[in-house]
Amino acid sequence: MSRVLVDSNVLLDVITEDQRWAQWSSTALERCAEEDVLCINPVIYAEVSIGFERIEDLEAALPTDLVERLPIPYEAAFLAGKCFLDYRRRGGSRKSTLPDFFIGAHAAVQDMQLLTRDAARYRSCFPKLRLITPG
């Protein structure tokens, strides 16, 4: 089984029952889980945690038997920094935060697919990254 890193936007769609994206995200998660191992890292965990008051509630929403938790390799952290620097040099917005670069670099370094709705940024910064996106 291969691994799929699940971006926080997909998890939040389902958790918050987002009117526009919950159905797509839920279906995508189910399809990926049939053949692959769903994974998150500490950055994704932190981004999703914003919607929870208690860690116990977050833990219940992301059970370890359904979602594997992976550390971010130092190689991915280095790549994230370099890609972010390149993005800024190309005129990228200061509003763009480093977490997305950690997520993309982690998937790239460990040769995982990335399940996300934010295709444009990941494609521009990590062109070889295999994405699972809407449409």
Where are these regions (language model features)?
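Short, well-structured N-terminal submotif of metal-dependent ribonuclease cores
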Residues: 1-40, 50-61, 132
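Active-site neighborhoods of divalent-metal-dependent phosphate/nucleic-acid chemistry enzymes
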Residues: 68-117
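Histidine- and aromatic-rich ligand-binding microenvironments
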Residues: 7, 40-41, 96-97, 118-119, ...
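Alpha-helix capping/helix-boundary segments
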Residues: 10, 44, 76, 102-103, ...
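Acidic, PIN/NYN-like endoribonuclease modules and their adjacent C-terminal/linker elements
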Residues: 3, 30, 104-135
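Short loop->beta-strand "edge-of-pocket" segments that line small-molecule binding or catalytic clefts
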Residues: 4, 37-39, 66-71, 113
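Active-site-proximal, substrate-binding regions of enzyme catalytic domains
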Residues: 53-75
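Short, flexible loop segments at the rims of nucleotide/cofactor-binding pockets, characterized by
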Residues: 15-18, 47, 90-94
